[in-house]
Amino acid sequence: VRSTSMINSLVDEYGKDVNFLMIYIREAHPIGGREVPNNQFQVNAPTTLIQRCELAEDFDDRIQMQMPIVVDTIDDTVADVYAPWPNRMVVLDGNGKIVDVGIAAAGGTRESSRQLPGLLDRLLKKEDN
């Protein structure tokens, strides 16, 4: 959530050349789970895909991501394949090959956002050749 403005800036800068997509996998701090003080999202962990979709929509309404948001299956297919927990950027090249898996740690999305321009510049230069 704290990295939203950084990510939105990347979408503004690279969005004409790069497809950005956020995948809502699961609530990081549900009520009765790994709660954090002053969490602006006081929600229960979803038990159905419809509930997860509603949480993703609420998240987007509050956070205003400037990219499409899709939702993982309730059995966590994307989470199991890409291991993006808690937050992680995964970069695919134009052929769908994973070229970078961001940092999976507190603050990892912010740090990945700082590193992403260099990576995207290199990838876009390669694809132009």
What are these regions (language model features)?
Residues 71-73:
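Short loop/edge segments at beta-strand edges and connector loops
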Residues 19, 32-33, 68, 108, ...:
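Short linear functional motifs in flexible/disordered or boundary regions
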Residues 1-63:
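Structural microenvironment flanking redox-active thiols in thiol-disulfide oxidoreductases
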